[in-house]
């Protein structure tokens, strides 16, 4: 990760040294990009979370976070989330989708995530680290009171043992009800 930020710093230095001597090779960063750069450089992730940049080092605004819970119903699963960050960040929350199809009360089958800090509770003082910890918390403490997947929420609320069985079955690549899930363990 440090290498990524050294590349960005070198590009900034080259841009400054070219000042007045031809076109700059680096575009000017928006306030959102600068804030995101700061947030990423200050990330303090648990060992069970990893960040990657599938579009390369020059696209910090789109990245993926992989969460591998080390406790709870989702123990040992691998869940990938895509983050799209607009230039309006931090005044606008990042767009987060779960790329891994998962049986979860707070994540629907299309990957939409129900996390209050990504909606009505977003504030500019929050950062990417806060969002990642929020996602991690969804796997250690799924919330049946604010669901996107109402069926999973009802099972969690009414029969936690059946919910645990369904989660394991889904994570092993099985079927829950009429829905098939890819293996994610």
Curated annotation (Swiss-Prot):
It comes from the Eukaryota. GO terms for biological process: protein neddylation. Residues 8-29 are annotated as: Disordered. Keywords: ATP-binding, Nucleotide-binding, Transferase, Ubl conjugation pathway. One of its GO terms (molecular function) is transferase activity. Residues 31-176 form the UBC core domain. The keyword Nucleotide-binding applies. SUPFAM superfamilies: UBC-like. The active site is at residue 114. Its EC number is 2.3.2.-. Pathway: Protein modification; protein neddylation. InterPro entries: UBQ-conjugat_E2_core, UBQ-conjugating_AS, UBQ-conjugating_enzyme/RWD. Residues 16-28 have a biased composition (Polar residues). Belongs to the ubiquitin-conjugating enzyme family. UBC12 subfamily. Accepts the ubiquitin-like protein NEDD8/RUB1 from the ECR1-AXR1 E1 complex and catalyzes its covalent attachment to other proteins. This is Probable NEDD8-conjugating enzyme Ubc12-like. It comes from Arabidopsis thaliana (Mouse-ear cress).
């Amino acid at each position: 990760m440090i290498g990524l930020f050294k590349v960005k710093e070198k590009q900034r230095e080259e841009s400054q040294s070219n000042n007045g001597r031809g076109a700059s090779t680096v575009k000017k960063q928006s306030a959102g990009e600068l804030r995101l750069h700061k947030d990423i450089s200050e990330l303090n992730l648990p060992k069970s979370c990893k960040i990657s940049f599938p579009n390369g080092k020059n696209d910090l605004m789109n990245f993926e976070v992989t969460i591998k819970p080390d406790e709870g119903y989702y123990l040992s699963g691998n869940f990938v989330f895509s983050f799209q960050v607009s230039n309006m960040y931090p005044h606008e929350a990042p767009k987060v989708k779960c790329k891994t199809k998962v049986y979860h009360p707070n994540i629907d089958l299309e990957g939409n995530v129900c996390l209050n800090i990504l909606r009505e509770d977003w504030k500019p003082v929050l950062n990417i680290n806060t969002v990642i910890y929020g996602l991690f918390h969804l796997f250690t403490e799924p919330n049946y009171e604010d669901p996107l997947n109402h069926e999973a929420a009802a099972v969690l609320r009414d029969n936690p043992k059946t919910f645990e069985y369904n989660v394991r079955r889904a994570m092993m690549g099985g079927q829950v009800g009429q829905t098939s899930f890819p293996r994610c363990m």
